[in-house]
Amino acid sequence: MTRFAVLPLSVLLLVLLFLCTESLAKSEESEEYDVAVPSCCGFSSPLLIKKDQWKPIFETKFGQISTVQIGNGCGGMGPYKIHSITLEPNTILLPLLLHSDMVFFVDSGSGILNWVDEEAKSTEIRLGDVYRLRPGSVFYLQSKPVDIFLGTKLKLYAIFSNNDECLHDPCFGAYSSITDLMFGFDETILQSAFGVPEGIIELMRNRTKPPLIVSETLCTPGVANTWQLQPRLLKLFAGSADLVDNKKKKEKKEKKEKVKKAKTFNVFESEPDFESPYGRTITINRKDLKVLKGSMVGVSMVNLTQGSMMGPHWNPWACEISIVLKGAGMVRVLRSSISSNTSSECKNVRFKVEEGDIFAVPRLHPMAQMSFNNDSLVFVGFTTSAKNNEPQFLAGEDSALRMLDRQVLAASLNVSSVTIDGLLGAQKEAVILECHSCAEGEIEKLKVEIERKKIDDERKRRHDERKKEEEEAKREEEERRKREEEEEKKRWPPQQPPQEEELRERQLPMEKEWEMEGEEES
């Protein structure tokens, strides 16, 4: 019989501690060197979501919230929810508990963001600001009075994603209100949790549930422009460490009571990564904004002047979800590969984008964005990756093709090395290029594709109708044949043919005559 050595419990605990330490070290090393997590980004094909496809989830005269969802959550990433939050001047978005990682960009207006994660924090936000809030934070948002320079309304776009690998409840949205958090529990639980008389809980429960967005005067009656609500309320709901009966944490209580000021990143006050007469780009990652550390989301902004193009490029590590802030343009995305799949779902695509539209491009899909000759194109992009993403360009000074062997590249394109030298050396610009009438050419091709699709759809419709008619006729013929067979079975056994009946009738008189003649003879 084989003997098994039984390790002492202390040894097992030491082994387990070692494994956990190694895992943590690898995790920290991955974060330090920005090692990407291999997985898909929640969607596998280019997407275009038009402005009228935003789904409103809340709307009053004080503001509104609309949402769209990108992807299906494959590979443990996504789905990504994009929210558009708009507040009228002097209004408040009441406290919310975040269920997901939140990265946002301020499109217009100004206000104050207050939140609690481990501490109570606050920051002023305005047009062009980028910031991030972690899951589990409790936050609320206040809009300032009308500002003729920044805009009359506070509007921001936010992306929500789940970075953790823990189980995710599909019933959970991006956030929940403090009211739902409070009164989802019974009175007895709340009374014991807060240590207050039953009457207080009953009084609060019987109050009318307020909407998510309210006028500031409803929160602070008789007081104008009160920009700091009591942080203790947020600390209470967030489960702040100050509420824990711990001596060491009590010593830091006075420090915790202070609302710390946080710093945002403003795209309009920072030096662009690239700028030319044809446009500018700026990318914000964890190196630019410390709160992005640990997030799977980065932010970029592209401004194309009239008749310009973001040169053909692809993202080696990130998917890109972009929102058009201003103007209109065309987007071209390639989906071709060496496979023989020629279905319409795998063809290259082009589409027109306008203010308020969202377009999403998966990782490694070559793309180009173009502005029209009479309009600029400005869009903010959310990139989804655990690694810093450096776009690779097809042409220009930063062309990835320049790194390849010229003879090998010439053989790939079936041209001479001299031709390759001329091809790669002609373009002196980079990243954003002049492209006069490129967008106009793309939209004309798009119109042709739409007309061709209409013709193909009509041809397919007629073919389907004809096939349906043939199948219907075949079915009716089959039913008729079955009815005839059933009627034939009902007549069984078969009747004698009429000719035999007539013959028998003729034979009967003759038989009678023969019988009579026989009787007479006898």
Swiss-Prot record:
It comes from the Eukaryota. Residues 1-25 form the signal peptide. Residues 466-491, 501-515 have a biased composition (Basic and acidic residues). SMART domains: Cupin_1 (SM00835). It holds the Pfam family Cupin_1. Residues 457-522 are annotated as: Disordered. Keywords: Coiled coil, Glycoprotein, Signal. Residues 265-421 form the Cupin type-1 domain. Glycans are attached at N206, N303, N341, N374, N414. PANTHER family: CUPIN TYPE-1 DOMAIN-CONTAINING PROTEIN, OS03G0336100 PROTEIN-RELATED. Seed storage protein. Belongs to the 7S seed storage protein family. This is Vicilin-like seed storage protein At4g36700.
